[in-house]
Amino acid sequence: ASLPGIVNELDLSGTALGWLDRGSEITGANLQEGDVLIGLPSSGVHSNGLSLVRSVVDHCDASWDDIAPFSVEDGRVERFRQGELTLGEIFLNPTRIYCDPIVDLIQKGPCDASHIHAICHVTGGGLSNLLRLHDSLGWHIDSPLPVLEEFSWIQEMGSIEIREMYRTFNMGMGMVIAVSEEVSESVLEWVSGRVPGSAIVGKVTDNGRVVTHLDPAVRFDTY
């Protein structure tokens, strides 16, 4: 783990393993131009980029107990106290775990698992994680999920360039699934029933190993 400012002597970590039948691995090897990208919304920062968050909060001379100077969607943040939402509650909102819907999609979803060509966790590295899934194909995000309010606040308060935001944070999209175009609508309907707010966000391209975005400033060709 890379946790500057927090871990000085002890780093305690854990590992979880999953398995598939031999030959049914989803590695990205079956990706092809035109595959549809389905984005699953995040619940917040997902425990990534917190060093930058702390830096911005300190720079603003704010406190984690301060009432958030922005509003968030009702019910998105898990509450542990009464009253108005604080910055601490928002930035420590538990990470959404996609294990159950993803495993169910593979095992009993609306299409054969062979149509699921890649799955990407948008974690540290942001959208550049997509580059890890194929050596030559690219990814174009032309309909990004809505940016969560806390990310907009961090960008404004920290005067952070949009590309750096998408490299550091998930920006509201915690996972991407790449599926065959012919099953994309049925998969989207199925996934949306389990992770509300999911949407088609783009396609796999054949314009080189690069991630491009609706905002031309957001572009990655290295991880």
Language-model features and meaning:
Residues 1-53, 203, 214-215:
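Glycine-rich anion-binding loops of enzyme active sites
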Residues 5-10, 80-223:
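Glycine-/charge-enriched secondary-structure boundary and capping motifs
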Residues 24-27, 62-65, 140-141:
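Phosphate-handling active-site elements
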Residues 26, 31, 57, 132-133, ...:
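Ubiquitous "structural anchor" signal
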Residues 33-90:
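Acidic, glycine-rich loop-and-beta core segments that form the ion-binding/anion-interacting portion
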